[in-house]
Amino acid sequence: MTLRFEASCPDGLCPGWSVILKGETPPEASKFEINFLCDRDDRVAFHFNPRFTESDIICNSYMANRWGQEERCNHFPLGVEEPFQIEIYSDNDHFHVYIDKAKVMQYKHRVEDLKTITKLQVVNDVKISSLEITKKLFY
């Protein structure tokens, strides 16, 4: 696992926060991950994992020392060495995922206390050109 970015947000990243990652993948890319981590117990509230070798996006949560049921999105709009923008934002019920401004999926929260989601991590085969974490206004 190669760490590309990590940030702590002690007040919590959910709900109402938006993460916008701009980047591209290197020619040898097989996968990368965006993880929303909890402040205790090594829990992963949301694991977003595009896999280029499978042309699939795997999402999951790691709770109570085990991975939950995978959710797959077989719409795969990412290409190796092609620039992209991924936005992930959270409301009270879901993480919403947009790639190049088109919604590709939503993932129901599996963590009850959303304020415990305090860390963002990006790992593996991705070259980050910018990453922005902002409060999103809901209308």
Curated annotation (Swiss-Prot):
Arranged from A to Z, the UniProt key words for this protein are:
Lectin
SUPFAM superfamilies, alphabetically? Concanavalin A-like lectins/glucanases
Q: Which GO terms describe its molecular function?
A: carbohydrate binding; lactose binding
User: As annotated in Swiss-Prot or TrEMBL, what is the tissue specificity of this protein?
Assistant: Localized to the lens of early embryos (48 hpf), particularly in lens fiber cells (at protein level). In the adult, expression is highest in the eye but is also present in oocytes, brain and intestine.
* GO BP: camera-type eye development
Q: What region holds the Galectin domain?
A: 5-134
Pfam families (UniProt xref): Gal-bind_lectin (PF00337)
Q: What's written under domain?
A: The galectin domain, in contrast to the one in mammalian ortholog, is a functional carbohydrate-binding galectin.
Cite the record's note on assembly.
Homodimer.
Task performed by this protein: Binds lactose.
Q: What is this protein called?
A: Grifin
Q: What is the lineage of its organism?
A: Eukaryota, Metazoa, Chordata, Craniata, Vertebrata
Q: Which gene encodes it?
A: grifin
